[in-house]
Amino acid sequence: MRRIKLVVSYDGTAYCGWQLQPNGVTIEEVLNKALSSLLKEDIQVIGASRTDSGVHAMGNVAVFDTESRIPGDKICFALNQRLPDDVRIQASEEVPLTFHPRKANCVKTYEDKILNRKIDMPLQRLYSYFCYFNLDLEKMQKAASYLIGEHDFKSFCAVRTQAEETVRTIYSLDITKVNDLITIRISGSGFLYNMVRIIAGTLVKIGMGVYPPEKMEEILEEKNRAAAGPTIPARGLTLVSLEYEKELAPYLEGENKHWHYVLDQRNVPEKGLAYLTIERCEPEELDGVLRRVIHQAYRNGAKRVFVRDTFGEEGSICGYYRLRRQPETEEGWLEAVYEGEHR
């Protein structure tokens, strides 16, 4: 058995998103059918990002398992002959069977385009959101700066999201304008359901002058979807790329006004041991930080995590932690369990 990775680009206009749907054609369905026809076996792809209806992609990633002996880097050429014109495989390669496109650490980059002029342009209508009101780019850029870093983005996700954890890290958020077209380019560790489109909708409101730029920080603190702006239409949104981590980062750091921690992963590859130092943390956020960061360490290969704090009573949370699976939950949620200070 071999695992093949695909880099997939598509015009999402005619599709009901990525994920299989009972009442509409999806990208996943098209790929499954084309691959099954090409390889003469039942193929089910696993996508990295399950984009919504109307969202486009330049570099989404998918994998599938096959018994075929066709060279991995040649599959893209054969597969493109069987795909519709609005779906193309940009590259294909064989990867380890352990590689999972949704579980591997990566940086996701999206672009959301806004056509900002008095009269709509028909040629842009499927690939941008039209805004009649003049938008103040400087105010939008200032507001965007509040979102950089690790934050709880609960205000910026759809109410019906299934995510139990709403903390994400934004590495960059750039807003540029060329002629009448504004591009919001955002890179992060991952995104909640509708998160990019809600951020874009909030930035539009700030650009219109409905909110001052400083309102963005207040919206973050609210942790309430009703506090943020509207979810703008999907047609202007494109998944640009997913850049996977080639080797484990020696350190992970998370910092905002509520917490600051450093996760040392240098001993994970050889000893399976990570060290988490919590420099400061508000008491009500501590359980969430512990659970989230220890879970990330285990995903990265750690078997145990040693925690120490420098902000509170010495020894209050210090010691070794492991993860315990909760069998009573369908998802098998992993809970951080204190083991004590023994080795």
Placement of each model-derived feature along the sequence:
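Acyl-donor binding region in acyl/amide transferases
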Residues: 271-322, 328
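A conserved beta-strand-loop-helix scaffold within acyl/acetyltransferase catalytic domains
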Residues: 257, 263-272, 278-279
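Structured-RNA-binding interfaces characteristic of tRNA pseudouridine synthases
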Residues: 1-262
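Short, ordered beta-strand-loop transition motifs
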Residues: 104-106, 175-180, 266-271, 324-332
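C-terminal "cap" of GNAT-fold acetyltransferases
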Residues: 328-343
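Proline- and acidic/polar-enriched loop/turn elements at helix boundaries
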Residues: 50, 92-94, 309, 327-330
